[in-house]
C-alpha cells in the first residue's frame, strides 16, 4: 500500500511548504501552518483529476485570439433583478459563484428561492450538507415555495456529488456549504484548508467541463471575511457577500470578484415572512429621515457598482471627559475619519482634539469610496456648530490633504439621481459642476475646504 504524503499548509492563505515553519512567507502570518496528510493515488488518476480544469476534456491545442470563436454567452435570470445586477446581468452557464455571509443572513433562503424559481424551466440540483432534506422542505413550505420540480440531495462527498450530477444532468447546482464537503484524496477533516481548496477545485472543474452553473455557500470569520484559504477566492469566478444581521430586516449583497461583470455592485433585499424580497429603490430606505431638522446629518451620493445611491451619514461631536477622546466610525474607514479631522483642523480652523467623534452611515451600508469625504466633513461641521443642514441638500466630493476639493466620477449622474429624489440644493466639486446646470437645482461648486464651509454658512 502506498504511503500517505505529508504537506504543510497555511490556514490563512493556503500556501504550501515542504516542512513546518513558524511564519508563512506568503501572507506573513505566524503560527498558521499545519500538517495535512494526502492519500497516495496512482499517477494516472491524479493526472486525470488535474486535467481539463478550464474546460472540457477534449484534446488541447494552441490558438491565436483571432481563431477563437466568439459567441455571446446566454445568461439566464435568477428571478431576482437585484441578484442579476450583482452577478453582472444574470447567471452565466458554467460559472462558479461563492456566496458568503454571517449566520442567519439569508444565504440558504436566497438560494432556495432562486432554485425553486429556476426549477420550473430547467433541471436543478440542491445539495445540502448542513441540513436534512426534511428541514429544507419545511423551510420551503414556510416560505410558500413550489416544491414539485426542485431535486434535493443530502451529501458531503464531492466525488459522489459529481457522480450523481453526471447522472441527473442539472443546469444549475447549489452546494451548501463548502466547509462541510470533503474529498477522499485529502486525509484531513472537512473545513480544513486542504479540504476546502480541493473541494472548490473539483466543483469548479465540474462546472467548467459540464457547463453547469454552481453556487457554493461559504462561511465567514468573526470579522466578516470569507472563511478558508485566500486561494478559494482565486479558484471561483464570482465572489459575493450577503451582509446584514438578524436585527436588521434589510440585507445587502455585494460582489467582491466577478469575471463576468462589475465588482462592488450592490443589491438590496428585505427579509420578510415569505423570504427575501428585492428592494427596487434602495435610496428610499437609506433616507428615512425624521420630520425635524437635526444637526450632524447630511446626505451623500455614492456610486455602488453601476448605479448611484443616496445615503445619509450622521455625526456626533461632543466634549470628551476622557484623556484620549474617542473616534468611532461605523460604515466608514476609521483612518479616513482621522484624516478628515486633521484636514478640518489644518485648513478649516476647527479644533476637535478634545471632542468625542462618532460617525454612522444609516442603513448599515459600508462606504469605501472617497466621494463621501465632503459629506462627512459637512456632517462633522453641522454637529460641532449644532446647526442642521437643510433636508434638500445633497453633498459629494473628495477632500485632499491640502484642503482642496477633488472631483469624483459620474458627477452628472449623481446630481440627476439626487434631483429625482427631491433634492434642490447641492455642494459639489467645481470640476463636477454641470455646464448647463440643472433646472430647479441650486448647485454650489467649491474648490477648497474654506469655500465649502462658506457654502455651509449660506445654506
Predicted feature locations:
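Peripheral, non-AAA+ core regions of ATP-driven protein-machinery
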Residues: 2-12, 16-85, 92-98, 105-123, ...
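Divalent metal-dependent catalytic cores for phosphoryl transfer on phosphate-bearing substrates
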Residues: 133
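P-loop (Walker A) phosphate-binding loop of NTP-binding proteins
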Residues: 102, 129
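Conserved RecA-like ASCE P-loop NTPase motor core of nucleic-acid helicases/translocases
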Residues: 124-128
